[in-house]
Design a protein with these regions (language model features):
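Extended basic (Lys/Arg/His-rich) segments that typically form rRNA-contacting surfaces
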Residues: 1-239
Length: 239
């Protein structure tokens, strides 16, 4: 089990050995410093606290500086805790870099989705409009009926409505690492990652054991079966 803190750089694309385009998200992962180590004997569970991104001391509170000074670590802007099975292998002051992961690893990436402010039900929940004619007005983008009257005299849970959109913690599971650049501390993961450019993300080894099949994973290298169908059987069906 491995983990690291990073920032989203943006999206790009990488070509594999077959010339196929792989959309990737580039993440600046680490370097992170182990600030605290928790053990099952003392705290009841094994975990480590990582610090990321240096910051001036004046930006932190006295309790935060006391916590970092106790560990002998320079001031850090972000502190995050990870439950790791191999927490015993890490010690306070150790540096965790991008080369902790390798190409082919599957990870879960957690970030904060982009905030869109106060939005209506059409944009927020993809609700449908009322008819533009035949008495559908005067308001066409409202939420519609909220429920019954005397019975049940309430709005059922799950009813969509207007409100704050985005700015939620989102975790994308089972993203495979396509490329790792240890010199620049960059990790390229397949697909999209929540949050804007520069947003904080947490990368951790996936908790799921199954693997997601990609769109091109079932395509055969045999040109006669490139479409996934047997041409002989296909021709027999047309006769």
């Amino acid at each position: 089990m491995k983990a690291i803190i990073g920032k989203k750089v943006g999206m790009s694309q990488i070509f594999d050995e077959n010339g196929k385009v792989i959309p990737v998200t580039v993440i600046e992962a680490g370097p992170c410093t182990v600030v605290q180590k928790k053990t099952a004997e003392k705290e009841g569970y094994a975990a480590v606290q990582l610090g990321y991104e240096d910051v001036p001391e004046r930006k932190l509170t006295k309790p935060e500086m006391g916590h970092l000074n106790k560990a002998g670590v320079a001031p850090k802007k972000y502190l995050r805790e990870f439950d790791l099975e191999n927490a015993a292998e890490l010690n306070v002051g150790d540096i965790v870099k991008a080369d902790t992961f390798k190409e082919g690893d599957f990870v879960d990436v957690t970030g904060t989705s982009k905030g869109h402010g106060y939005q209506g039900v059409v944009k927020r929940w993809n609700a449908g409009r009322t008819p533009m004619s035949h008495g559908g007005g005067p308001v066409h983008r409202h939420a519609g009926s909220m429920g019954s009257t005397t019975d049940p005299s309430r709005i059922f849970k799950g009813k969509v409505g207007a409100g704050q959109m985005g700015c939620d913690q989102v975790t994308i599971q089972n993203l495979d690492i396509v490329k790792v650049d240890p010199e620049l501390n960059l990790i390229a993961v397949r697909g999209a990652v929540p949050g804007p450019k520069g947003g904080l993300v947490l990368i951790k080894s996936t908790v799921k054991t199954h693997r997601i099949k990609h769109a091109d994973s079932g395509i055969s290298n045999n040109p006669q079966k490139a479409s996934g169908r047997n041409p002989q059987k296909a021709s027999a069906r047309t006769k």
